[in-house]
């Protein structure tokens, strides 16, 4: 097994761990999920370029009679990247004490203000950061609003 194969195995393991965390573990952390909203995907073209580059590496490895293990690992990496970018939806998870956005937990008490832009982007101002949240369906903005109104304290 070459160093390349070891590096590919490490990256595949890290991406699988991230996918499992994002899909299953995050839902169980910090209490019950009270509202889940799907967000718009970002940078689809970046993943297409990444998968295309991996396809070129697979082609080069096959044409140069490279190790079959390397080819399988490259294909596995491409499949995981495809899943993370095109099949899995980014999501906003509302819990009792805060919400998960971009895999980070943000407590409600950190919210300084909330605004809605003209093009349907929810802007949440935190202490030192501004979140720009683009929901997949505009009806979800009303669900978020109702959630905050019902759970004010």
From Swiss-Prot:
It is found in: Cell inner membrane. It holds the Pfam family DUF986. The chain crosses the membrane at residues 6-26, 45-65, 67-87. It is a multi-pass membrane protein. GO terms for cellular component: plasma membrane. Keywords: Cell inner membrane, Cell membrane, Membrane, Transmembrane, Transmembrane helix. NCBIfam families: PRK02913.1 (NF002791). Belongs to the UPF0266 family. This is UPF0266 membrane protein YE1773.
């Amino acid at each position: 097994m070459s160093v390349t194969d070891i590096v590919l195995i490490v990256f595949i393991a890290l991406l699988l761990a991230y996918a499992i965390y994002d899909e299953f573990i995050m839902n169980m952390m910090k209490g019950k999920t009270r509202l889940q909203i799907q967000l718009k995907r970002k940078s689809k073209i970046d993943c297409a370029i990444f998968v295309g580059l991996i396809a070129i590496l697979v082609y080069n490895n096959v044409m140069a009679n490279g190790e079959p293990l390397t080819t399988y690992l490259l294909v596995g990496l491409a499949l995981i990247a495809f899943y993370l970018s095109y099949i899995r939806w980014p999501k906003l998870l509302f819990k009792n004490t805060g919400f998960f956005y971009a895999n980070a937990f943000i407590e409600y008490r950190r919210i300084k203000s909330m605004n809605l832009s003209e093009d349907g982007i929810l802007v949440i101002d935190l202490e030192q950061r501004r979140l720009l949240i683009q929901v997949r369906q505009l009806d979800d903005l009303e669900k978020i609003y109702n959630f905050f109104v019902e759970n004010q304290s």
